[in-house]
Amino acid sequence: MGRKNRRNRQRRTEQRSPAEEERRKAREQAAWEGGYPEIIKENKLFEHYYQELKIVPDGEWDKFMDALREPLPATIRITGYKSHAKEILHCLKEKYFKELPDIEVDGQKIEAPQPLSWYPEELAWHTNLSRKIIRKSPELEKFHQFLVSETESGNISRQEAVSMIPPVLLNVQPHHKILDMCAAPGSKTAQIIEMLHADMNVPFPEGFVIANDVDNKRCYLLVHQAKRLNSPCIMVVNHDASSIPRLLIENNGSREVLYYDRILCDVPCSGDGTMRKNIDVWKKWTTLNSLQLHGLQIRIATRGVEQLAEGGRMVYSTCSLNPVEDEAVIVSLLDKSEGSLELADVASELPGLKWMPGITQWRVMTKEGQWFEKWEDVPTSRHTQIRPTMFPLKDEEKLKSMNLNRCMRILPHHQNTGGFFVAVLIKKAPMPWNKRQPKLQRRPPVSVCDASVAPEIVKAVADISAIADEPAVDAENGETKPCTNQSGSSKTDSVCCPPPSKKMKLFGFKEDPFVFLSEDDPIFEPIQKFYALDPSFPKKNLLTRTQEGKKRQLYMVSKELRNVLLHNSEKMKVINTGIKVLCRNNDGEQYGCAYRLAQEGIYSLYPFINARILTVSVEDIKVLLTQENPFLSKFSKETQKQANNLDMGSIVLKYEPDPQQPETLQCPIVLCGWRGKTSIRSFVFFLHRINLVQWIFI
């Protein structure tokens, strides 16, 4: 084997030209000397293309190019729905931002971080520091550690400024049903979840987010992002966005199609607006990327507006500056919608943001640099690469009525950001092709009680019915017909398994099932008694990921997501949903209850708990966070008194702020803990402990 590899290596060396051999040696030498040469930030075709399109105002081209060659500044966003967001902001301002202007890195004086003028409540900040400098500089190590720990705990998100724009324009309310079509890696999804939980006093908002991505591996990155926020209102699914299935929900005894109030359509794009952070784009950029993605972008956006509710809002966005991926897609949607869609004027919703209006005239260029003014000029040989929808409409009056000036193009040099495009669409009526959709014709069902029918046939018919069971849609008003089974009782199957093995090929890897607890499940009564759960506690929203054996962990979803899960198990590939609220003790029921509380779900569960609660002071919180298993004597007398009245087992540790003492911590804190024989300990992740200590006590 070794001799064969040597022969192959020699053969490859002999086949190289002298110039190739010289380049290879140069690369190896550069690697030995400490790294490869930097990518030259220059692309003549890119400059020629955008200068011809005139998307940059006259006299600003040099500033535009200079900005693209500079590294992207670091931007952070403070999680808005957390009750201690104001405390985090105060900590950043007083303990970190004030020190930064006194620090120099590589001879460069650091500017004081500034809030993004257009983001609400000063919850987003940017600095002239790049992420690389923050990571590598010893002078900024303390600041970097704070950012890392706060990011892991979900209190801060490090997110590019322009990527914060689409969720803001969605104008999310807590009751909205939301679809994020291309969600990974999940920073925008996290922002949407925050908006759903704007009122922390409501543990289960009526709305929810279904976050989808076509890449199975990136779905797990999405799960990691969402888990930081500990929401019971998020579901991660794995589908091709251009054919994401239409889901069903039960409403007043009938099954109807789920239409979303808000849809985020952040489509795959060529990414030439990200040159400041993805420097590979400089050498790889051609117009071919945009031409190849245009069709997919239209299909995804079309599927989005089909599933949008009337009066709903869809935000279409790309990190590309190319009109083939931007205005051309919007024009195609508006044209075939026949008045069902309109562009919304959202300029007033982002005061302080600088942006350029959408353009109405552009040309299409091939990767070789050949220009085409209109579709009729394109030779037949190019028809597979260039499509009619890539060009502006010939009807100028119709084009003008589309109000493309309401589209927003963000240029990097205007506010030191990346490049971005965003448009907001409002659905006024059903799409034309949905209006023409005929009613579904149903064949009389085969009764499973009919002894004359072979059991195998009955089973096959039942399987087919389960897969194809969609409600009949009224072609005139989009309403659905009531759906009942033959016995007159509603379907209450509590097991949401993945699709059958034959269908599983469509969806990729098999996931564990989602099994909801039944109303009379014996494991719930001891839990309810031990923690004195309120009768209003929605126990039917508890689920586990196993059908057999002991239930080690219990998760919780909102009522609305339970509805979605129960009626669509055959249609969708669910990667993750719900938050962990209870974990099984290693010692079983030795301490009064077989399940202890989980920190991830405590903010959702706490409003229903009426027992096992210790009210603690700030000093007690410090003891809990800095000591692993402190004795009772370490706590205040009041805490010791409360603890003496509790048996061993899982407990809630609650800190309530005192408005009469404004100099003390002014946000509530809820921690999970364990009352031992002579001690109390907190069940809080190590990183979460660190960040709590940092912003409360340091």
Swiss-Prot record:
GO molecular function annotation: mRNA (cytidine-5-)-methyltransferase activity; tRNA (cytidine-5-)-methyltransferase activity; tRNA binding
Active site: C319
Compartments, record wording: Nucleus, Nucleolus; Cytoplasm; Mitochondrion; Cytoplasm, Cytoskeleton, Spindle
Enzymatic class: transferase
Reaction it catalyzes: cytidine(48) in tRNA + S-adenosyl-L-methionine = 5-methylcytidine(48) in tRNA + S-adenosyl-L-homocysteine + H(+); cytidine(49) in tRNA + S-adenosyl-L-methionine = 5-methylcytidine(49) in tRNA + S-adenosyl-L-homocysteine + H(+); cytidine(50) in tRNA + S-adenosyl-L-methionine = 5-methylcytidine(50) in tRNA + S-adenosyl-L-homocysteine + H(+); cytidine(34) in tRNA precursor + S-adenosyl-L-methionine = 5-methylcytidine(34) in tRNA precursor + S-adenosyl-L-homocysteine + H(+)
Mitochondrion listed as a keyword: yes
Family per similarity comment: Belongs to the class I-like SAM-binding methyltransferase superfamily. RsmB/NOP family. TRM4 subfamily.
Protein name (database record): RNA cytosine-C(5)-methyltransferase NSUN2
Organism encoding this protein: Xenopus laevis
Phylogenetic classification of the source organism: Eukaryota, Metazoa, Chordata, Craniata, Vertebrata
Gene: nsun2
